[in-house]
C-alpha cells in the first residue's frame, strides 16, 4: 500500500520545469517570507489555501489553518496519517508557475483564503505560500485493530481507535505546537474506507498554460471582524478539501489589505437598527448620524477610519471597539434573519397547502404565508426566489441536489438535511427525492440569458447576490458559518463524478451547517459567501449558484467526497477560524451552467491532476473506512476561467455584468441566509422578495400614491400607511387596492394636506402688520385680526358684519374717534393728536440687534455689569437670574400685544428691540415724550426711578394676562418706582377716561395701579383729574415669588398652590363655586373685597382708573397683587378701593380682580355684594339689589359694600370698557352676557342657546358663535354690547349703538345699569340715579343675582322675615322655591355650566346639566312626553315643548305663581329664547324696568314695568329693594327661582323687555298644535325657601309638612319622592293650564317632578 500510495500520488508530481505540481512553497522561497506573501506580519502566513499535506510549522494560515509546511520545504500531499512520511514529496515541487493547485481545508480560516496572494499592491505568486502538513488519524474498521499494514504510507497511527470512534486530527501550527481536534465520526465505517485512496502528495505543478485557471474560496473568520484578522487562531477542523487552481493575478490586481477587501456582507448601522448590503449605502446613511463635536476627533489626529461607516478615530483602541460594535450588530442581524427563516419546512405534495408556483407544500398556514412571500414580487420567469428556498424547501431548485445534502451537526447518522432548505430527511433516498422534487429546476436555467443581460432580473431577494456565473462554479460550504468556496466548472471530459461521489456517500454533516444556524458562532467571522478575490464585489449579485450549482453537478451525492464528520462541542471555538471550503464541480452536462467552457479552455494540467487524483484514490490500499476518509479529503479539481476582465472586476465595486465577474465576485452573506436581503432597512417582505436591482440603486423609493420619495423603506411604509389610513384601507390589504383607487378616493374626499400658512414675517420690519391701536406686531393678518377682535371686545363691540374684518372696524373706529378724543391708546394724552397712537405712528426698526440701552437711564451699555443683566430696562425690575428677567420680559411682550408664540426668540432682546422701535412709548405711559429718548427726561418725571424704562412700560400689561401673575420679585413694584406721589406719571389717571376703552396695549391693559408699592398718597396715585389720560402703568409685575393668600397671608410658590389654598378657604366659607373667572383665588379676593368695602370706615373710593385698567390690575394682579384681607392701606389696591369709587364697571369696587359678584347661592352669607362686575361693558353694569346682602336694605341703609359707590358716581361717565377682571380676552355671550375664558367655552354656550332656539346647524362660518350673533342681528335685538352710552347719559347710551368709545370725561351718570346679568339683550338699570343700596355690578357670570336685578325679572321674592332680619345677610345661598321667577329667557338656560343649569319651565337651578336633565325628564313625564326627540336631550326636548305649548306653559307657571292669571307677557318674559325676545334693558330712561327704582331708592316710573312689562308699577317705598322685590314677586312673568343666583340676565327681562319678548315670542312661536294634560297641580309654593344649602349640604323642606331633608345633593331624590307622595295623596284633577316659560327653582320643580 505504501508503494502504491506513494507511487500513485507521486506519479502526477513529475511534471518537469514549470509543470511541477504545486505544493506549499518552502518558507525560504517565499519572497519576503510569509509576511511578504500575506502582509501584516503574522496574521496569515499563507494567503489562501490549506493544502491537505503533512504540513509543518509553515502553516499556510500561520496558526489559523494549522497546516504548516516543514522548514525544509517538504510538504508532501499525504494522507493525514502519513504525518511523518514525507518521502514521496520532493521539496522542489512548488509553484513556480503562474498557477498553483492547492488543497483547501473545509474549515480553514476564510480570512486567509479570502486574501489574494498580493499584498500591499505587490503581486505575489501562489507558489510563495508556505506549506505544511496536517496529521490525521485513520478511522479503522471494527476488524482493524492495528495500524494499517501499509508501511509505505508511513502512517503514524498513535492507536487504533475503535470503529466509528472519533478520530483525532493533529495540526501543527506555526510554532510547531500540535493542536489536536477530536472528531466524532458520523457515518458508517464503510464510508471511511474510501479514505484509503488518498495518500498522494499535495504539490503538483501545472503548466503555465494553466494561467486561465484560478480558484477562490469563501472564508469565515469568527474571531476577527470582517476587515481584520486575528493573529493566532485555534486549530483547524478537518473536512473535505478543495484543490484549487489559482491563476496568478495580473500585476494590476493588488490584494488590498484585509480591511479593504474583506468587505462584510452586511453593513449594519450601529446607531440604529438599519443594515445595508452595500457599503456605499451605509456611508450615505451615516450622514444622518452626525457625531457630536466632542466625539469627532481632529482631522489631523484622526488617521484611522472605520472601513464600514467612515467614522474617524484617533485611537486604534476606539476604532477596534467601534468595529466590534459593527461586528456584534452584524451577527445579531444575521441571527435574527435566520430566525425569521425558521418556519416549518416543505411537507411535500401530500400537504394540505400547496404553492401554485412551485412544489412547496405545507400544512402550516404560517409557513405557507412565509413561503408565499418568496413569490410576492418574483419576476414572471422565476418559479422560486431563493437559492435555498428559505427554510421552506421552495428555494433554489437544482436537479438531483443530493450532493448538497448535509447532515446537521450532532444529528443521527441516518438523518440528513437538505442544504437548500434545511429539510431533514430520515434517509438519503428521501432526501434525494426531496431535492429532485423541490430543487429540481433552477430557475436561472430557464432564462439564464435574461439574467446575463439584466442583473436586476435575477432571482432571489438578495438584491445583488445572484448572477449567472458562466465561467464560475461556486464552492460548497460547510461549518456553522459555512464558508462558501467558489465552485468552478470543469470540462466533463476531464472529470469523473463517480470518483468524487460514490453511491454510498454520507451527506456532509458540518457543525451547525448552513441553513439551520448559519453564522451563529464566530463574532468576527468574515461574511459568508465571499469569493476569494478581495474585491468589493462581495455583495454583487453572483452568489446564487452556490448551492444550486453544487447540487446539479453531482446528483449522485456529494457526501462521498465529503466525509461526514462532526466535532466535539467544546472545540467549536477552534473551528470557527478554520478555512472551510467544500468543493463541488459544476460540469456543463449537469445543466448548472451552459456549456460555455470547452475542453480547450481547461488547462491540461488541471485535467491531468484530476486524473492523478482519481488514480491515486483507486490505487490506494486501505480499508473501506479509510477509503471513505481519503475520498472525503482528496482534492476535487474545479476548473474555471479567470480572465483579465475578472481581475478588473475584482477591483471595481460597482455593479458588474455577470460575465465579467467570473470568480472575482464575492458572494454576499445573504446567499447563505436564504437570500435575506442585507442591503437596506427593508421589512420581511423585501427580505424575501426584494428586487436585486433595488439595492444597487441609490435612487429614492417613490410612494405609489403620490410623488413623494423616501430614502428607506421604513419612511415609505409609514407614509403609505398614512395614505391607506386616509382612505380607510388597512396596510395589510394594500395589495388588493390599486394605487389609482387610493388616489381617486383621496381626491374624492379631498384628503389633501393643509397648506401651512407661511408667516410673512419680515425681520427687517419686525412685523409686516401692526395694530393701529396699540402697535403690536403680527406676522400674519390672522393674528392681527384676532388681536383687533380683542380690542373691539374691550370697547364693548362684539357684533359686526360677518364679512367685515375686525381690523377694518378697528381702523374705522379709531379714525372716527380720533376727533372725539378716543381713549388714548398707548397712553396718548387725551389732548394728544388723534393720530399719535404710538405703535402705528412709530418708525419700524429692524429687530436685529439686542435692544440698545440708549433709552435706558444709563448711557452705558445695558449689559455692562451683572446687575444690568438681570434688571428690566423697561420698568427697572430686578431679578436674581436672567431666567426670571426673561419671564418678566415675556409679560411685557404680552402687554405690548406680542403673543408668546411670536416671541419665540429671546424675549429680553425682543422686548428691548420692540421698545427701541417704539422709542419706549412715553405717551402711553403718560411720561414726557423725551422719556423714551433719554433717561434725563425720565428722571424729571420719576424722582427715584432707577430706570426711566421702569415707568415707561410699568408692566402695563400685567393685568391683561388672564389672571396670570407676572412673576417678578416681590420688591419689584417698589423698585425703581420711588417716584413721588405727585409724579406726573401717576397723574395720568384714567379716571377721566373711565368711559374710554383701555387699549389692549401693554399699557392699556395694565391696571392703573402705580408701580410704587403702597404709594404714600392714594390720591397722588389716582389723581381724579378728569382731563388726564388713563394711567397706563400696571401695578408692578406681580411678585414672582410673592404669591400669597390675601386671606391669611401665606406665601406660595405658584398660583397653583395658592389656588388650592384659596379653595380651602372658600369651602370653609361654604362657597363651592368659583364664580369669579372660575378661579378660587379671584373668588376669594372678591369676597374679601366685599368685606373690606362693607367696613363702615372705609373711605369712599375715589374715581378709579379706567375700569379696564383696574380690571386688569385686579384680575391680572392675581396673587401677585398681594391683595390680602388686610387693611386697605396694606393692599396695593386698597387705596383704590377706599378712595376712588370705581367707575361704574370699574373693578376698583372690589378686590383688584374685580371679579363678578358671586352667585347668591354660593356667596358667603356675610359677604357684601360685589360692587363691580368683572367686565364692565355698559350693559354689564348691573344695579344689583342684594337683599340678602343688604341687612339694612329695608331701612334704606346703604349696603356696606355699596358705600364706596355713593358719592363719586355723578362725576363718572359710564365706563364703556369692560373692566378686565374677567378672562383677559373678554369673551362673552352676546345673547346672555355671560363671560368665558376662551372661545371654546363660548362656542359650547352658544350652541346651547341655538339649540334652545331650535337651531341645530351653524350656518354662519360653521361657528355657533357667529350663527348666534347673526340670529341676534336678524332679530333686530339691540345688542348692548355694541352700544356705549354717551358720557352724559348712561341710559341713552345703553339704548343706542354709540361708538364703543366714549369721549373721556367725568362719568356723568352714577352708573350705567348693566342689562340684567350683563347679558346683551337684557335691559339695564335705567335711571341715572341709582340708590346707594344698589350695588352696580357688571354681570360677571352672566348669572342673575337672585337678589335683585334691577330688572324686569322680579327679584327673588324675599320673605318678609328675610328682609326684616338685617343681621341675617341672606346670601340666598339656598334654593328658594318661592323666589320670584327668574324670567330666564329661553337662551338663558342654555349655559351648560353648572351656573346655568336652570330649568326653563320652573326656574330651578341645578348644580350641573345632569341634574337638570333628570329634572327636565320629570317635567316631560308630567306632560306625557316620554321620548327626548330633540337631540336626545330631555333639556332640549323640554325647551321645544315649551316653545310649542305656550298655553300649557303659561298655565303651569300661573299655577306655580299661586293662581295668578296667566298672561302672555308672562310667557314672553319667561321664555324668550332669542335675543330678539329680550328688549334691551334700560336703553330708555324708563327702561329700567328691572328695578324701576330711582337712584334715591324710590321706584322709578318704569319700575312698575320692570317685571311684568309695566303692568304693575313698583311700590314706591324708599327701601326700593324691598319694594322692587315685592313687586317682582307679584309680577306674572316673575318665575319662581329656587335659588338666588348672581344677577342673571333673566332679571333684566322685565318691562319693555318683557313686552318685546312677548311680542317676538308670539311672532316666532307656532300656536300649540294641541293641548296636553298638565301634571296635577300642587298647592301654591310656600313663602319660605324650601331649598337651602351651605357648601355641599342641602336643607330641603317639604311644602306640605314640616319634614326637612338634609344632606348632599343626592338627598334631593328622597325629598322629591316625599313631595310626590303628598301630591298623589292630594289627588288633584289634572287641569291643563297653559304655563309658558317661567323657570321655577329646584324645589318647585321637584314638586312638579312627580310623575
UniProtKB/Swiss-Prot annotation:
InterPro entries: Transcr_Reg_ZincFinger (IPR051643), Wiz_C_Znf (IPR055125), Znf_C2H2_sf (IPR036236), Znf_C2H2_type (IPR013087). One of its GO terms (cellular component) is extracellular exosome. Residues 1030-1034 are annotated as: Interaction with CTBP1 and CTBP2 1. It is found in: Nucleus. SMART domains: ZnF_C2H2 (SM00355). Residues 1523-1541 have a biased composition (Basic and acidic residues). Residues 1214-1218 are annotated as: Interaction with CTBP1 and CTBP2 2. The modification Phosphothreonine is found at residue 998. One of its GO terms (molecular function) is DNA-binding transcription factor activity, RNA polymerase II-specific. Keywords: Isopeptide bond, Metal-binding, Methylation, Nucleus, Phosphoprotein, Repeat, Ubl conjugation, Zinc, Zinc-finger. Residues 1-79, 376-399, 546-578, 819-843, 972-1038, 1091-1174, 1283-1331, 1463-1554, 1629-1651 are annotated as: Disordered. The modification N6,N6-dimethyllysine is found at residue 1162. Signal peptide: none annotated. The modification Phosphoserine is found at residues 996, 1006, 1012, 1017, 1025, 1079, 1106, 1122, 1127, 1134, 1146, 1151, 1263, 1309, 1314, 1480, 1517. GO terms for biological process: positive regulation of nuclear cell cycle DNA replication; protein stabilization; regulation of transcription by RNA polymerase II. The modification N6,N6,N6-trimethyllysine is found at residue 1162. A zinc finger (C2H2-type) spans 267-289, 304-326, 353-375, 416-439, 701-723, 769-791, 870-892, 1043-1065, 1227-1249, 1397-1419, 1596-1622. Residues 386-399, 984-994, 1315-1328, 1481-1493, 1637-1651 have a biased composition (Low complexity). Residues 1097-1106, 1301-1313 have a biased composition (Pro residues). Belongs to the krueppel C2H2-type zinc-finger protein family. The C2H2-type zinc finger 11 mediates interaction with EHMT1 and EHMT2. Interacts with EHMT1, EHMT2, CTBP1 and CTBP2. Part of a complex containing at least CDYL, REST, WIZ, SETB1, EHMT1 and EHMT2. May link EHMT1 and EHMT2 histone methyltransferases to the CTBP corepressor machinery. May be involved in EHMT1-EHMT2 heterodimer formation and stabilization. This is Protein Wiz. The lineage of its organism: Eukaryota, Metazoa, Chordata, Craniata, Vertebrata.
Amino acid at each position: 500500500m505504501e508503494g502504491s500510495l506513494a507511487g500513485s500520488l507521486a506519479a502526477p508530481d513529475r511534471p518537469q520545469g514549470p509543470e511541477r505540481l504545486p505544493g506549499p512553497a518552502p518558507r525560504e522561497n517565499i519572497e519576503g517570507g510569509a509576511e511578504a506573501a500575506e502582509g501584516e506580519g503574522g496574521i496569515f502566513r499563507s494567503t489562501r489555501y490549506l493544502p491537505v499535506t503533512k504540513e509543518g510549522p509553515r502553516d499556510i494560515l500561520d496558526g489559523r489553518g494549522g497546516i504548516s509546511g516543514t522548514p525544509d520545504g517538504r510538504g508532501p500531499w499525504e494522507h493525514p496519517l502519513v504525518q511523518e512520511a514525507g518521502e514521496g514529496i520532493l521539496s522542489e515541487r512548488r509553484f513556480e508557475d503562474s498557477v498553483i493547485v492547492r488543497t483547501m481545508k473545509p474549515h480553514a480560516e476564510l480570512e486567509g483564503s479570502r486574501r489574494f496572494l498580493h499584498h500591499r499592491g505587490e503581486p505575489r505568486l501562489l507558489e510563495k505560500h508556505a506549506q505544511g502538513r496536517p496529521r490525521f488519524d485513520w478511522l479503522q474498521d471494527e476488524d482493524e485493530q492495528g495500524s494499517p499494514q501499509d508501511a509505505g504510507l508511513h502512517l503514524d497511527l498513535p492507536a487504533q481507535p475503535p470503529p466509528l470512534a472519533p478520530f483525532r486530527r493533529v495540526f501543527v501550527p506555526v510554532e510547531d505546537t500540535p493542536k489536536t481536534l477530536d472528531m466524532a465520526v458520523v457515518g458508517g465505517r464503510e464510508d471511511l474506507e474510501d479514505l484509503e485512496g488518498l495518500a498522494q502528495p499535495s504539490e503538483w505543478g501545472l503548466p503555465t498554460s494553466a494561467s486561465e485557471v484560478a480558484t477562490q474560496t469563501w472564508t469565515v473568520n469568527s474571531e476577527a471582524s470582517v476587515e481584520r484578522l486575528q493573529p493566532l487562531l485555534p486549530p483547524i477542523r478537518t473536512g473535505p478539501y478543495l484543490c484549487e487552481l489559482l491563476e496568478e493575478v495580473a500585476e494590476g490586481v493588488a490584494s488590498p489589505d484585509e480591511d479593504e477587501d474583506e468587505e462584510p456582507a452586511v453593513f449594519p448601522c450601529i446607531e440604529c437598527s438599519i443594515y445595508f448590503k452595500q457599503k456605499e449605502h451605509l456611508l450615505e446613511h451615516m450622514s444622518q448620524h452626525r457625531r457630536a463635536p466632542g466625539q469627532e476627533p481632529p482631522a489631523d489626529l484622526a488617521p484611522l477610519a472605520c472601513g464600514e461607516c467612515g467614522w474617524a478615530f484617533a485611537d486604534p483602541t476606539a476604532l477596534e471597539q467601534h468595529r466590534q460594535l459593527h461586528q456584534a450588530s452584524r451577527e445579531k442581524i444575521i441571527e435574527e434573519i435566520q430566525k425569521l427563516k425558521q418556519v416549518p419546512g416543505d411537507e411535500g405534495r401530500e400537504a394540505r397547502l400547496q404553492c401554485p408556483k412551485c412544489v412547496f407544500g405545507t400544512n402550516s398556514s404560517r409557513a405557507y404565508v412565509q413561503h408565499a412571500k418568496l413569490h410576492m414580487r418574483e419576476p414572471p420567469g422565476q418559479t422560486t426566489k431563493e437559492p435555498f428556498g428559505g427554510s421552506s424547501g421552495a428555494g433554489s431548485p437544482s436537479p438531483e441536489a443530493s450532493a448538497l445534502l448535509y447532515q446537521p451537526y450532532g444529528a443521527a447518522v441516518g438523518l440528513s438535511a437538505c442544504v437548500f432548505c434545511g429539510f431533514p430527511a430520515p434517509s438519503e433516498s428521501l432526501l434525494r427525492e426531496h431535492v429532485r422534487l423541490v430543487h429540481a429546476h433552477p430557475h436561472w436555467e430557464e432564462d439564464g440569458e435574461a439574467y446575463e443581460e439584466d442583473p436586476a432580473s435575477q432571482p432571489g431577494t438578495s438584491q445583488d447576490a445572484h448572477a449567472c456565473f458562466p465561467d464560475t462554479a461556486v464552492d460548497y460550504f460547510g461549518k456553522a458559518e459555512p464558508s462558501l468556496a467558489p465552485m468552478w466548472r470543469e470540462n466533463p471530459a476531464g472529470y469523473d463524478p463517480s470518483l468524487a461521489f460514490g453511491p454510498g456517500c454520507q451527506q456532509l454533516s458540518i457543525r451547525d451547517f448552513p441553513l439551520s444556524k448559519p453564522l451563529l458562532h464566530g463574532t468576527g467571522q468574515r461574511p459568508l459567501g465571499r469569493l476569494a478575490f478581495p474585491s468589493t464585489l462581495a455583495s454583487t449579485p453572483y452568489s446564487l449558484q452556490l448551492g444550486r450549482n453544487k447540487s446539479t453537478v453531482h446528483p449522485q451525492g456529494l457526501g462521498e467526497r465529503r466525509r461526514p464528520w462532526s466535532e466535539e462541542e467544546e472545540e467549536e471555538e477552534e473551528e470557527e477560524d478554520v478555512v472551510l471550503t467544500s468543493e463541488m464541480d459544476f460540469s456543463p452536462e449537469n445543466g448548472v451552467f451552459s456549456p460555455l467552457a470547452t475542453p480547450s479552455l481547461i488547462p491540461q494540467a488541471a485535467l491531468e491532476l484530476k486524473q492523478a487524483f482519481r488514480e491515486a484514490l483507486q490505487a490506494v490500499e486501505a480499508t473501506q473506512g479509510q477509503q471513505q476518509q481519503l475520498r472525503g479529503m482528496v482534492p476535487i479539481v474545479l476548473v474555471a476561467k479567470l480572465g483579465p476582465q475578472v481581475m478588473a472586476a475584482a477591483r471595481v465595486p460597482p455593479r458588474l455584468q455577470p460575465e465579467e465577474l467570473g470568480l472575482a465576485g464575492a458572494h454576499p452573506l445573504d446567499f447563505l441566509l436564504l437570500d435575506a436581503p442585507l442591503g437596506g432597512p427593508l421589512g420581511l417582505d423585501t427580505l424575501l422578495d426584494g428586487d436585486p436591482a433595488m439595492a444597487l440603486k441609490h435612487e429614492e423609493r417613490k410612494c405609489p400614491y403620490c410623488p413623494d420619495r423616501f430614502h428607506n423603506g421604513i419612511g415609505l411604509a409609514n407614509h403609505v400607511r398614512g395614505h391607506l389610513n386616509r382612505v380607510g384601507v388597512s396596510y395589510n390589504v394594500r395589495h388588493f387596492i390599486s394605487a389609482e383607487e387610493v388616489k381617486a378616493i383621496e381626491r374624492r374626499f379631498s384628503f389633501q394636506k393643509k397648506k401651512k400658512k407661511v408667516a410673512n414675517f419680515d425681520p427687517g420690519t419686525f412685523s409686516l402688520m401692526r395694530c393701529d391701536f396699540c402697535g403690536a406686531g403680527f406676522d400674519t393678518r390672522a393674528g392681527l385680526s384676532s388681536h383687533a377682535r380683542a380690542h373691539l371686545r374691550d370697547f364693548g363691540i362684539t357684533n359686526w358684519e360677518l364679512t367685515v374684518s375686525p381690523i377694518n372696524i378697528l381702523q374705522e373706529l379709531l379714525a372716527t374717534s380720533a376727533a372725539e378724543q378716543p381713549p388714548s391708546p398707548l397712553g396718548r394724552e387725551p389732548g394728544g393728536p388723534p393720530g399719535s397712537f404710538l405703535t402705528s405712528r412709530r418708525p419700524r426698526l429692524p429687530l436685529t440687534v439686542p435692544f440698545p440701552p440708549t433709552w435706558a437711564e444709563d448711557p452705558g451699555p445695558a449689559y455692562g455689569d451683572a446687575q444690568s443683566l438681570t434688571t428690566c430696562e423697561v420698568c427697572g425690575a430686578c431679578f436674581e437670574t436672567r431666567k426670571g428677567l426673561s419671564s418678566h420680559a415675556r409679560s411685557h411682550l404680552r402687554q405690548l400685544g406680542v403673543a408668546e408664540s411670536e416671541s419665540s426668540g429671546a424675549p429680553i432682546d425682543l422686548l428691548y428691540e420692540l421698545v427701541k422701535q417704539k422709542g419706549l412709548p412715553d405717551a402711553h405711559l403718560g411720561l414726557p415724550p423725551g422719556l423714551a429718548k433719554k433717561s434725563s427726561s425720565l428722571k424729571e418725571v420719576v424722582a427715584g426711578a432707577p430706570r426711566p424704562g421702569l415707568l415707561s412700560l410699568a408692566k402695563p400689561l400685567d393685568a391683561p394676562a388672564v389672571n396670570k401673575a407676572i412673576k417678578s420679585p416681590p420688591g419689584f413694584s417698589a423698585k425703581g418706582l420711588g417716584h413721588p406721589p405727585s409724579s406726573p406719571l401717576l397723574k395720568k389717571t384714567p379716571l377721566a377716561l373711565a368711559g374710554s376703552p383701555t387699549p389692549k396695549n401693554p399699557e392699556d391693559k395694565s391696571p392703573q395701579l402705580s408701580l410704587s408699592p403702597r404709594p404714600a398718597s392714594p390720591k397722588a396715585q389716582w389723581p381724579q383729574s378728569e382731563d388726564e389720560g388713563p394711567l397706563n402703568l400696571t401695578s408692578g409685575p406681580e411678585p414672582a415669588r410673592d404669591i400669597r393668600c390675601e386671606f391669611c397671608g401665606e406665601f406660595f410658590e405658584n398660583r397653583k398652590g395658592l389656588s388650592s389654598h384659596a379653595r380651602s378657604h372658600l369651602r370653609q366659607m361654604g362657597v363651592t363655586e368659583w364664580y369669579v373667572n372660575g378661579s378660587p383665588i379671584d373668588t376669594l379676593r372678591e369676597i374679601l373685597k366685599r368685606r373690606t368695602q362693607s367696613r363702615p370706615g372705609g373711605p369712599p373710593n375715589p374715581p378709579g382708573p379706567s375700569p379696564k385698567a383696574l380690571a386688569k390690575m385686579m384680575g391680572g394682579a392675581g396673587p401677585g397683587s398681594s391683595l390680602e384681607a388686610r387693611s386697605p392701606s396694606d393692599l396695593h389696591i386698597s387705596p383704590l378701593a377706599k378712595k376712588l369709587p370705581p367707575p361704574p364697571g370699574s373693578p376698583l369696587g372690589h378686590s383688584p380682580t374685580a371679579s363678578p359678584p358671586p352667585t347668591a347661592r354660593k356667596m358667603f352669607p356675610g359677604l357684601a355684594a360685589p360692587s363691580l362686575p368683572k367686565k364692565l361693558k355698559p350693559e354689564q353694569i348691573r344695579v344689583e339689589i342684594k337683599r340678602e346682602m343688604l341687612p339694612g336694605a329695608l331701612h334704606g341703609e346703604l349696603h356696606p359694600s355699596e358705600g364706596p359707590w355713593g358719592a363719586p358716581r355723578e362725576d363718572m361717565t359710564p365706563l364703556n370698557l369692560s373692566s378686565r377682571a374677567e378672562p383677559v380676552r373678554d369673551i362673552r355671550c352676546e345673547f346672555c352676557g355671560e363671560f368665558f375664558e376662551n372661545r371654546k367655552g363660548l362656542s359650547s354656550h352658544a350652541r346651547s342657546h341655538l339649540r334652545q332656539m331650535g337651531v341645530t346647524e351653524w350656518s354662519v362660518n360653521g361657528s355657533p358663535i357667529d350663527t348666534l350673533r347673526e340670529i341676534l342681528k336678524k332679530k333686530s335685538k339691540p345688542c348692548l354690547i355694541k352700544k356705549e352710552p354717551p358720557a352724559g347719559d348712561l341710559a341713552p347710551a345703553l339704548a343706542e349703538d354709540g361708538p364703543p368709545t366714549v369721549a373721556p370725561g367725568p362719568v356723568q351718570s352714577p352708573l350705567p345699569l348693566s342689562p340684567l346679568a350683563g347679558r346683551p339683550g337684557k335691559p339695564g338699570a335705567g335711571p341715572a340715579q341709582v340708590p346707594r343700596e344698589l350695588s352696580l355690578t357688571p354681570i360677571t357670570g352672566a348669572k342673575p343675582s337672585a337678589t335683585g336685578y334691577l330688572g324686569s325679572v322680579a327679584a327673588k321674592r324675599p320673605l318678609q322675615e328675610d328682609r326684616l332680619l338685617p343681621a341675617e345677610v341672606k346670601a340666598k345661598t339656598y334654593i328658594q322655591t318661592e323666589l320670584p321667577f327668574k324670567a330666564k329667557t329661553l337662551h338663558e338656560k342654555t349655559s351648560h355650566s353648572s351656573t346655568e343649569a336652570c330649568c326653563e319651565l320652573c326656574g330651578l337651578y341645578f348644580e350641573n346639566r345632569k341634574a337638570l336633565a333628570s329634572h327636565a325628564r320629570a317635567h316631560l313625564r308630567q306632560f306625557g312626553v316620554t321620548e327626548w326627540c330633540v337631540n336626545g336631550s330631555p333639556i332640549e326636548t323640554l325647551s321645544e315643548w315649551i316653545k310649542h305649548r305656550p298655553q300649557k306653559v303659561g298655565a303651569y307657571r300661573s299655577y306655580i305663581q299661586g293662581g295668578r292669571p296667566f298672561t302672555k307677557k308672562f310667557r314672553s318674559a319667561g321664555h324668550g329664547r332669542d335675543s330678539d325676545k329680550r328688549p334691551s334693558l334700560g336703553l330708555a330712561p324708563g327702561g329700567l324696568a328691572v328695578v324701576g327704582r330711582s337712584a334715591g331708592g324710590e321706584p322709578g316710573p318704569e319700575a312698575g314695568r320692570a317685571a311684568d312689562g309695566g303692568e304693575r308699577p313698583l311700590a314706591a317705598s324708599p327701601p326700593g329693594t324691598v319694594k322692587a322685590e315685592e313687586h317682582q314677586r307679584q309680577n306674572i312673568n316673575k318665575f319662581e327661582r329656587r335659588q338666588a343666583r348672581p344677577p342673571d340676565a333673566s332679571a333684566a327681562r322685565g318691562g319693555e323687555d318683557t313686552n318685546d319678548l312677548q311680542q317676538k315670542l308670539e311672532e316666532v312661536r307656532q300656536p300649540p298644535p294641541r293641548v296636553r294634560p298638565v301634571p296635577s297641580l300642587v298647592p301654591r309654593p310656600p313663602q319660605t325657601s324650601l331649598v337651602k344649602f351651605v357648601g355641599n349640604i342641602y336643607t330641603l323642606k317639604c311644602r306640605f309638612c314640616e319634614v326637612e331633608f338634609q344632606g348632599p345633593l343626592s338627598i334631593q331624590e328622597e325629598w322629591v319622592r316625599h313631595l310626590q307622595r303628598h301630591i298623589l295623596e292630594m289627588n288633584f284633577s289634572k287641569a291643563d293650564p297653559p304655563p309658558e316659560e317661567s323657570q321655577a327653582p329646584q324645589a318647585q320643580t321637584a314638586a312638579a317632578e312627580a310623575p
